[in-house]
């Protein structure tokens, strides 16, 4: 059991002196400190001020002394304490009420091992406006002075060397170079500090070393990938017809010739080029300089048999062959055009091509003129109208045609042929797209406000365009091709109404709009006012007529 009174032993007596914690220096640390303290300061640590009799007084500033103490002893190797502050005098002027006072301060500097030095410092002020300001200035001055005097007791490096006149006479002659300000040495806030992005060094590419396949360990199998969700959520709203895929079952009216029909149709017309040349036909040299026209894939699919064809813009024109059909379409749709040899004068002639049908200077592109009915003579495969070597006919195919190619297909189909499922049909109509009933969506025609097509204006007599091709009208008994009705020249521009100069505003057939004369100036019509009738100033004796408003009524 504890003895009586032991419970009070744990509490320190506040009236006893506190023994500081002492950490003894080793002999090596004492020798190191002694060496540092004996060294003298350089000229960069000294400062000078004007003293009595015009002399310079050298001293060490307080901030430099504190920095030297932290450098020599360490920031936790020394401490300072104020031992006493005593006011010597305080005087107040009776008239101005200004304060003058003086006081002295005793400061002790203690090291880690308990070694300390004390010294006195003095502070004063004269004619200060207030007492608080006077005491603040005097106490700070006395404390700083006492601290510097206490630190100089430790050695030369803390300011004691300043009292050596021989040392001052030599050190003041040294020139101090101005220090270069370095921004990197500043302690900056994290938000304002400049962050230099250090680029990571790129490692050189590692060359793959040849490894022995027999000794190399096999790679672990890859983890199975999760099964992908079905695309019903993504493509469920679309229909197969939206992709414009030609389906043989969905379009039974489109017929495609088999592959053997192309060969039979081209081989059976080898003697068609021996017809006589007309007076207006170009010479043989001009025909050889014509550019060969490449038949498209749609032309190759249509033979001279005249079978039904897919929907095309010019379905009313009966095509007699690849070359004849293309020439007729160009002449009927675009009017008169210059001949090929005139159009090609500005361009360099293409290299000559081998043509087997050179008799009488006629080429496969020329159309014969005769008294009998014209015959459709498609050019042979070896004529000049065929595509040059290395060029293939251009056509659009469906993306689904690749999936329908069998895996055992060894040879590709011959150029110029295509299956009905592979061709891309731009005229395919999708049943999933909403369309207004009663509107023809295959053509661009004006629509009235009632939602119906505007009927076309009747064609005037002779208003249709005549066939500009002289070869179509040269033969006897040859019927002209049916022409599409051409719109009247007085008809306004429907596609671009802003370019129509005869545009009218309002309902058709109504009165002219007053805004139609906006581009002309018309002066306002001024009607001449009739003169006033003469009215007598005198009054009558009451004999006036009762209907006269100018006379006074007596009754």
Swiss-Prot record:
Task: Extract the Gene3D superfamilies matched here.
Answer: DNA repair protein Rad52/59/22
Q: Where is the composition biased (Low complexity)?
A: 260-276, 354-375, 382-404, 479-490, 536-547
Where is the DNA-binding region? Answer: 148-152
Write down the superkingdom of origin: Eukaryota
The terms under GO molecular function for this entry are: DNA binding
One GO term (biological process): double-strand break repair via single-strand annealing
This entry carries the following GO cellular component terms, namely: nucleus
Q: Where is this region: Disordered?
A: 197-232, 251-555
Which SUPFAM superfamilies is this protein grouped with?
Answer: dsRNA-binding domain-like
Where would you find the membrane-spanning parts of this chain?
Answer: none
Induction of its expression: In response to MMS and UV treatment, and in response to heat shock and oxidative stress.
Q: Which UniProt keywords apply?
A: DNA damage, DNA recombination, DNA repair, DNA-binding, Nucleus, Stress response
InterPro entries to which the protein is assigned, alphabetical: DNA_recomb/repair_Rad52, Rad52_fam, Rad52_Rad59_Rad22, Rad52_Rad59_Rad22_sf
**Main subcellular localisation:** nucleus
| Cysteines joined through disulfide linkages | none
Bias (Polar residues) ranges: 283-300, 312-334, 468-478, 491-500
State the compartments where it is located: Nucleus
Q: What job does this protein perform?
A: Involved in DNA double-strand break (DSB) repair and recombination. Promotes the annealing of complementary single-stranded DNA and by stimulation of the RAD51 recombinase.
Q: Which family does it belong to?
A: Belongs to the RAD52 family.
> What PANTHER family does its record include?
DNA REPAIR AND RECOMBINATION PROTEIN RAD52, RAD59, DNA REPAIR PROTEIN RAD52 HOMOLOG
Subunit info? Part of a complex that includes RAD51, RAD52 and RAD59.
This chain belongs to which protein, by name?
A: DNA repair and recombination protein rhm52
Gene symbol? RHM52
